[in-house]
Amino acid sequence: MNNETIKKAQDNMDKSIKVYQKRLASIRAGVANAALLDNVQVEYYGAPTPLTQMSSITIPEPRVLLITPYDQNSLDDIEHALLASNLGLTPANDGKVIRLVIPQLTGERREEIAKEVGKYAEDAKIAVRNVRREAMDALKKEQKDGNITEDEQRNLEKQVQKITDDSTKKIDQLADEKRKEITQG
């Protein structure tokens, strides 16, 4: 059971980091990035459909996203979804494709985005700490039930602490990289 507890904690911490990475990818840093559109849902024949499943998204220039729908009839639906998505971008529809021009970020907006990155990092760290707490509680229960000795419990708790520290470092590293990308963009 003890190795299962460690493995489960590691898996859950890895999931928290992956969620954080997805969140970071959706933050606009002044450069075109197709991940910006990952969460855009288009009302298509009455059903919400991810934009990425109904169009090809290319980056012809560093600050331009080009959206080419597989079905030309969905062009207006895609445009409406982009306007409603709170991305802060205005789509340009030429009848065949939609262009999204990513504006240059102002210094003030860069600071706001950097704060957002920090907030997301803190959320990810809280998720990691919650996983740590659950693992520690599980180890205490194992020891109380007589399945592991106190020494084994202490050693396993050290392992849990190590993977917690590693996960927190990874989150900090990702946040620093994103902040650097934002401030240099």
From Swiss-Prot:
Predominant subcellular localization, coarse grouping: cytoplasm
Domain of life: Bacteria
Name of a matching Pfam family: RRF
Key words of the record: Cytoplasm, Protein biosynthesis
SUPFAM superfamilies attached to this UniProt entry: Ribosome recycling factor, RRF
Ranges where the record places region Disordered: 140-168
Compartments reported by the entry: Cytoplasm
GO process terms (BP): translational termination
GO molecular function, one term: ribosomal large subunit binding
GO CC annotations, alphabetized: cytoplasm
InterPro entries given in the database record: Ribosome_recyc_fac (IPR002661), Ribosome_recyc_fac_dom (IPR023584), RRF_sf (IPR036191)
HAMAP family: RRF
Family: Belongs to the RRF family.
Function description: Responsible for the release of ribosomes from messenger RNA at the termination of protein biosynthesis. May increase the efficiency of translation by recycling ribosomes from one round of translation to another.
Protein name: Ribosome-recycling factor
Gene: frr
